[in-house]
Amino acid sequence: EIMNYIQANYIDVTLDDLAEKFYLSKPYLSKYIKEKSGVTFGELVKKVRMKKARAMLKSSSMTVENIALTVGYQNVEHFNRLFKKAYNMTPVQFRNQK
């Protein structure tokens, strides 16, 4: 249920929100997420956002800036850096590849 909540609320979910919603302590929740996903809460949210961004880049004509905002990044340069680090290419390069 926690993982589904993160998937559905990836844009603005915080560890504080999750802890409050599921009546769990933040340390316990952090450990649980790490055990279930293999990554930290922050890394998990980033992975979900990047996956959603990839899908949008392939299936829409939205600008990279709008996609960044849609998946929860206010700064497009930050989004571009994270995307390039994750996929070894910029969002534009990803969109243009065949």
Question: Where is each model-derived feature located?
Answer:
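General nucleic-acid-binding
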Residues: E1-D17
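Terminal helix-turn-helix DNA-binding modules in bacterial transcription factors
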Residues: M3-A8, E35-Q74, N96-K98
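Basic/polar phosphate-binding segments, predominantly the helix-turn-helix DNA-binding elements
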Residues: D12, D16-V48, A68-T90
